[in-house]
């Protein structure tokens, strides 16, 4: 190391300077300084500092629905009744699995996860009883999903366990809908690959979900961090899986749908707020998610912080935050792309990042990314996220051999440049030692 600094590309959260302290203080004061608010006694809203309703404040859900409609422009509009509030995306995934699957009982047969996958998602599925029941689904070379493989595996599992009618549990009021399969994915600016799935892929995936009674859980947490659109306007996001599902749903045959958008404000405001939301096709599924035992006991898990978020949205402050973040991350992503091309081996496989936090970098044949990452951290003070972190439990595909995930959320441009220079230097040492082309 030339100096004592550590450059950490593993971190997937904003730089401290990007955390909107002043905006949050301003919104909190606007929310709490009045002694009374018109909705304080409304059971669908409640005072910000008391227990909230199970689904979360109505006015906040209405503000989020407006934001969704402005950014996604769905064919069939999102309404407040389609949304419930959560304690963030991690809580949201846990709650979805708890409320819609029965892995322990064997009814929900299999969980499918896109691979490479978010590196902390495995434990949540293991906690929900999916140990030994998790299948990796690759992305294709063009950044889409291997839907043929997914369809083949669904057909195999259905042949092993003949299909039954969709299960609802009549003892609960309202009845609880349970799915035979579940799939986890990040369709837009995926973590870790950075891929965005086309509308055709999304449509075909919803069709498969309906055919095999599979719930699609999409982490829609990066959708609004687009770099390839003017940053002075709200981003125009691709239709989410929920919007594709809703646009073609026959409610006489299915009033639940097969999709849940699991979203968070951690990436576009601040992770410490621990606040997110979920959206489903109709009000039935989010109603089920909101009426688990914990919410019935304590109300929405982010009553105060969700109202701070609602204030940020309704005052227009969130739009300004998005504008700033997208500009900052775009600049960093451009520096990263140039540095990859300048410092890494010529045959490195890397696609320029056009949104979100992450991108995926694969070194040429013969390079060992795991060994390179160890040397980088120990001798050069650079921390990279080696591909081995992004495997699906019990269905590994070998991402640790040559691939790493890179992040622009935490490091400043000069740190990105220097980190990639050191990365390239170690790759050069590696190539020289093994007689590899550089």
Predicted features along the sequence, with ranges:
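PLP-dependent enzyme catalytic core of the Aspartate aminotransferase-like
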Residues: 58, 66, 254-255, 378-379, ...
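Conserved glycine-rich beta-strand-loop-beta hairpin in the small C-terminal domain of fold type I
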Residues: 303, 310, 323-337, 341, ...
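Conserved core of the PLP fold type I
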Residues: 33-213, 217, 223-250, 260, ...
């Amino acid at each position: 190391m030339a100096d004592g600094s550590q450059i950490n590309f593993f971190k997937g959260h904003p730089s401290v300077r990007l955390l909107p302290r002043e905006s949050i203080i301003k919104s909190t004061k606007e929310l709490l300084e009045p002694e009374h608010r018109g909705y304080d006694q409304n059971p669908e809203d409640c005072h910000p500092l008391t227990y909230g309703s199970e689904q979360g404040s109505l006015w906040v859900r209405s503000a989020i629905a407006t934001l969704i409609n402005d950014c996604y422009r769905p064919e069939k509009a999102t309404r407040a009744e389609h949304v419930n509030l959560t304690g963030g995306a991690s809580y949201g995934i846990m709650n979805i699995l708890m409320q819609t699957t029965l892995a322990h009982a064997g009814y929900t047969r299999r969980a499918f996860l896109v691979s490479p996958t978010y590196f902390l998602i495995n434990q949540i599925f293991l906690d929900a009883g999916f140990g030994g029941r998790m299948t990796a689904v690759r992305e294709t070379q063009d950044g889409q999903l291997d839907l043929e493989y997914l369809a083949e595996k669904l057909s195999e599992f259905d042949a092993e366990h003949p299909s039954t009618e969709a299960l609802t549990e009549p003892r609960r009021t309202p009845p609880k809908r349970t799915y035979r399969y579940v799939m986890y994915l990040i369709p837009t600016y995926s973590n870790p690959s950075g891929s965005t799935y086309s509308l055709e892929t999304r449509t075909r995936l919803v069709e498969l979900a309906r055919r095999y009674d599979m719930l699609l859980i999409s982490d829609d947490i990066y959708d609004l961090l687009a770099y390839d659109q003017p940053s002075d306007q709200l981003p125009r996001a691709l239709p989410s899986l929920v919007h594709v599902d809703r646009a073609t749903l026959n409610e006489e045959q299915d009033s639940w749908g097969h999709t849940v958008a699991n979203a968070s404000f951690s990436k576009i405001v601040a992770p410490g707020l621990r606040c997110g939301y979920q959206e489903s096709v109709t009000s039935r599924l989010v109603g089920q998610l909101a009426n688990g035992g914990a919410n019935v006991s304590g109300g929405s898990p982010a009553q105060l912080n969700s109202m701070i978020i609602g204030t940020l949205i309704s005052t227009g402050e969130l739009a300004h935050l998005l504008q700033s973040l997208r500009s900052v991350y775009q600049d960093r992503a451009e520096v990263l792309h140039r540095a990859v091309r300048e410092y890494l081996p010529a045959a490195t496989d890397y696609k320029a990042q056009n949104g979100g936090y992450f991108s995926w970098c694969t070194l040429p044949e013969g390079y060992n990314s795991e060994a390179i990452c160890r040397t980088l951290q120990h001798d050069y003070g650079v921390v990279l996220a080696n591909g081995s972190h992004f495997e699906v439990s019990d269905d590994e595909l070998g991402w640790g051999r040559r691939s790493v995930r890179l992040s622009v959320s935490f490091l400043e441009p000069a740190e990105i440049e220097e980190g990639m220079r050191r990365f390239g230097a170690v790759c050069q040492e590696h190539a020289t030692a093994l007689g590899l082309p550089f």
